[in-house]
């Protein structure tokens, strides 16, 4: 949220510290600089951090969003991460969309709000981002009870909002 308050560009993109962008990422993003859309969803490749040529097990789940008959809705309502998206900064400001102040899963509700309130979105199947996974990755490591409860509550918060908005894509 501190970073969002300091952002000044037309678009926002996110990255985790251990992930990386493709060589042509910014060429691809540049194609959308004058897009009327509020969010552009891009494909992401999931790889092992110690061997980026090896796909991680999370890859199939996310890639299947793009194989769906209607990938926009899958990505809008079931993608719980901020990366792999190009989000118009003015849209985030207008709807006061920020991250939850939790130690984990702070991006789940953020992504849910973005998906629900963006009036105009599009998808691009090209890969712009590599999400790395290791044995210590938060998403893949064994979670303590408190972490599981935080993740569960974040999902329930999204599900309540989706139901309230009469959107039938539950996490």
PLM region spans:
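Donor-binding/catalytic cores of nucleotide-activated saccharide
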Residues: 17-124, 131-148
């Amino acid at each position: 949220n501190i970073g969002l308050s300091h952002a000044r560009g037309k678009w926002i993109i996110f990255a985790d510290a251990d992930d990386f962008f493709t060589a042509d990422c910014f060429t691809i993003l540049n194609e959308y600089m004058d897009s009327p859309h509020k969010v552009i969803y891009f494909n992401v490749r999931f790889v092992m951090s110690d061997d980026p040529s090896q796909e991680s097990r999370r890859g199939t789940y996310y890639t299947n969003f793009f194989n769906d008959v209607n990938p926009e809705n899958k990505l809008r309502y079931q993608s719980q991460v901020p990366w792999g998206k190009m989000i118009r900064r003015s849209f985030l400001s207008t709807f006061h969309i920020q991250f939850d102040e939790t130690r984990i899963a702070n991006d789940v509700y953020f992504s849910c709000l973005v998906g629900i309130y963006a009036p105009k979105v599009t998808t691009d199947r090209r890969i712009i981002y590599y999400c790395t996974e290791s044995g210590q990755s938060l998403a893949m490591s064994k979670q303590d009870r408190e972490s599981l409860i935080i993740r569960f509550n974040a999902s329930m918060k999204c599900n309540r909002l989706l139901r309230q908005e009469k959107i039938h894509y539950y996490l």
